[in-house]
């Protein structure tokens, strides 16, 4: 009886080990977020003028996210519906359900990666680039992100080029209203974390291309706005201090 028991146990061990390894190599997660928020606006964003009535409403975010991960590949798809309670009819054939994230990340090695698709860009204190998650809709970008990381250094290069639709001819005139607020973007971000000092530092350079062409003729003209700066943090002995400085360059106001 004992011999049979030990034989069965030994047969099970390889199967258990294989199952555990497979689970670590291939991970699939799914999350659901329902986030209603009631607001009473009595002078929101600007003082309320005399005679104007306050506003009240309930908005809601319903988001479904699915993510797959293994050693060299990570993919995520996330879709959401954002709206105000009562905004849609009870019978609605045209639902407003959009993709807020749809990207794939390929790890070329332990240090280098490329991430392509619709993604959230969140850096430092999120003053320049952030996910804006406090907003009911959040914020996303259609971009290619190339990165390097080691225990002390992180470097990201972000590239984006936006158009309103597929066209055969007509140039690259871009209508920013109701779409992404820029025509193209190139961003470099570097973060350094020291093992010996309580200081961390980040450097950011962003070049934004903004469409300023002729809307009537669709003649495209792009002006560029550069933003550069640093973000520094200090954490030691109960102290937590952070500071940021950014500077913008533009030949002509856009």
Predicted segments, located by residue:
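Outer-membrane beta-barrel proteins
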Residues: 39-45, 86-89, 123-128, 164-170, ...
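Beta-barrel outer-membrane channel/assembly domains of diderm bacteria
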Residues: 19-118, 144-149, 155, 230-244, ...
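Bacterial Sec-dependent N-terminal signal peptides
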Residues: 1-22
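Signature for the C-terminal beta-barrel architecture of outer-membrane proteins
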Residues: 21-23, 107-114, 132-253
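"Short basic amphipathic alpha-helical interaction patches in structured regions
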Residues: 91-92, 129-134
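Short, solvent-exposed loop/turn segments at the edges of secondary structure
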Residues: 5, 99, 139-141
């Amino acid at each position: 009886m004992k011999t049979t028991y030990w034989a069965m146990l030994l047969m099970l061990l390889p199967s258990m080990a294989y199952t555990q390894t497979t689970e670590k190599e291939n991970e699939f997660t799914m999350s659901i977020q329902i986030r209603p928020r009631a607001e009473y606006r009595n002078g929101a964003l600007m003082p309320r003028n005399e005679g104007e009535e306050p506003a009240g409403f309930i908005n809601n975010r319903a988001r479904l996210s699915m993510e797959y991960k293994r050693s060299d590949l990570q993919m995520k798809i996330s879709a959401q519906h954002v709206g105000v309670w009562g905004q849609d009819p009870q019978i609605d054939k045209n639902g407003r359900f959009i993709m807020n994230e749809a990207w794939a990340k390929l790890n070329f090695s332990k240090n280098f990666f490329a991430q392509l698709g619709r993604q959230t860009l969140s850096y430092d204190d999120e003053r320049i680039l952030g996910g804006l998650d406090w907003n009911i809709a959040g914020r996303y970008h259609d971009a290619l992100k190339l990165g390097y990381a080691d225990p002390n250094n992180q470097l990201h290069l972000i590239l984006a080029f936006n158009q309103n639709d597929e066209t055969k001819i007509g140039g690259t005139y871009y209508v920013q209203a109701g779409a992404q607020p820029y025509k193209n973007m190139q961003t470099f971000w570097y973060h350094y974390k020291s093992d010996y000092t309580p200081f961390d530092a980040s450097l950011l350079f962003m070049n934004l291309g903004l469409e300023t062409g002729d809307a009537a003729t669709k003649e495209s003209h792009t002006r560029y706005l550069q933003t550069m700066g640093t973000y520094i943090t200090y954490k030691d002995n109960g102290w937590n201090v952070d500071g940021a400085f950014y500077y913008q360059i533009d030949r002509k106001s856009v």
